[in-house]
Amino acid sequence: MNHLGDYDVIVIGAGHAGIEAAHAAATLGARTAVFTMSLDAIGNMPCNPSIGGTAKGTLVRELDALGGVMGLAADATYLQSRMLNKGKGPAVHALRVQTDRKRYHEYMKHALELTPGLAIHQAEVVGLEVENGRVKGIVTQLNGEYTVKCVVLATGTNLGGKIFVGDAWYASGPDGMHAANALTESLKAAGLPLRRFKTGTPARVHRRSIDFSRLECQPGDPDNELQPFSFMTDAPMHNKVECWIAYTNPETHKIILDNIQRSPLYGGMIEGVGPRYCPSIEDKVVRFAGKDRHPIFVEPCGENTEEMYLQGASSSLPEDVQNAFYRSIKGFEHIEILRPAYAIEYDCVDPTSLEATLESKVVRGLYGAGQFNGTSGYEEAAAQGLLAGLNAARNALGKEQLILPRHTSYLGTLVDDLVTKGVMDPYRMMTSRSEYRLTLRQDNADTRLTPIGREYGLVQDDRWTKYQHTQNILEAERRRLHDAHLRTADLQAAMTAAGLAPAAEGGIAEELLRRPEIHYDLVAGVIGWGEGITPMLAERLETEIKYAGYIARQDRMIREVARHEKTLIPEDFEYADLTGLTLEAREKLARIRPKNLGQASRIPGVSPSDVAQLSIALAAHT
């Protein structure tokens, strides 16, 4: 073995989780290295060429507010931008962009190269060195040894990766990368509770083989309505491409059903559990037998490639069946498949074996992020990566680690779900998972999280200065709207011009904005736009005012829950002695070892009566 270096933090993997982990750790001043099997795979998008979406867009904004990289990268490399769910309430508005996957990789690679204090190594990590229950080093395929204080595992689908297409399978990571099998054995030897999950991806096809005249066009939002992901992005935005929608049909479904036993999933070859909320096309046809069609979103992979991505049509059926069912779709009659669809099975950890800091309970100093923790999605991975990298660095530097409660963020909700409830299939963030989604909107992520990022060392001076400037603008406008009075004649004229029934009388701007039909631009047409107020900030202020009553109610809920969060449970608390608890509750509490009464109350199988008994026991214990 050749000793080659010593670091505070080593990150294994440079996908979406690994990038954020490495950047965060180095930004905090930890001596950091990131290891990847290929520099050409940094920030790779092996599945959909997009960032954001429902709930995921909020995660990206939260990442950015904390000082992460993903939002900036998405803004620099987007092709088309759309705000989803605009017809619904602001709690579920979600920014999503199509991304140039090659430019995204190049942006992220360069971002890591420019990060001070970060070393980048192309090498496969084949083992961990663990002593007395704590990680001490790593070993590479070339017999290189590095000593380390903390390690972040961000292995994606490479860990024990196995690809399936029909009855063919081979060991592999995504996009032709080789699988990391030796590391799996090292993790098992260290005692980590591993399991098998699987995911899939659709075919990539040649643009020239699609008859777009037979598809529905899906344009982006008007250029004057586009919003960036990053609170640091000021450059004007414009859409560069269009996306399209095709549909399966009964013939497509018949081809799939006639060949369903040739699917490795239905033929029993695949052991891993697949994602519930991103099923393969064969899953959709079987599970939703009453549906005559399913949409397929046709998305470009970049400006300088002819590859098109078929979102909604992932499959593990054999190539001949793929050719047949894709070509049965209107507009795809002459489709040319460049890369066949496939399923990939991989190793991940039971996330209930992790602390809320994302540190392993089994091996101290070892952190997990992304698909290793049982999640799916680039955004979920990146958000965990930032938290894991930050905490690994603070652990290595002897500083307090960060735990984000559920009420602070979607990231806090995601982590709490993972470590408290666990997962039975790849976890995807959704707005319905948060009980506080009206206060956890994508527009206020900076207010919620940038002060935390600053306190914990991630938010740099330029971001902090801009944050303070934005908050000053918002506060000044809140005061102005609270004081400004609109005369009846002026308000009636503005409403008539907007095609609205005129109000009976004028009033204070803030009170008028509580009405559903009155919007900021109408009020501003009378009293003028506030200094520094952009359409994006105007929408944010209007949401705060219109939903003030609901937001206040959620704030009261948060304060009530916080009381339980403050009731701490000693690490060595003995649940077996609490005969008032059900057997299931005792077993789950002893296994998960919640940090406080609030977390205990969210464990599946722990009832309100169990929580009440535990509360009494804790009071007696103190």
Show the residue positions of the predicted features.
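Beta1/beta-strand and adjacent pyrophosphate-binding region of the FAD-binding site
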Residues: 3-17
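Core beta-strand elements of the Rossmann-like FAD/NAD(P) dinucleotide-binding domain
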Residues: 5, 141-150
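Conserved N-terminal/central alpha/beta ligand/cofactor-binding core
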Residues: 23-131, 142, 154-171, 178-183, ...
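An anion/pyrophosphate-binding glycine-rich loop and adjacent beta-alpha core
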Residues: 38-40, 56, 83, 184-323, ...
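Glycine-/small-residue-rich beta->alpha transition segments that form the dinucleotide
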Residues: 150, 155-159, 317, 330
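A glycine-rich dinucleotide-binding beta-alpha-beta segment and adjacent secondary-structure elements
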Residues: 309-375, 403-416, 534-588, 593
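Internal hydrophobic alpha-helix adjacent to the cofactor/substrate pocket in enzyme cavities
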Residues: 381-402
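Extended, charge-enriched "interface" segments that sit outside catalytic cores
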Residues: 433, 439, 445, 450-612, ...
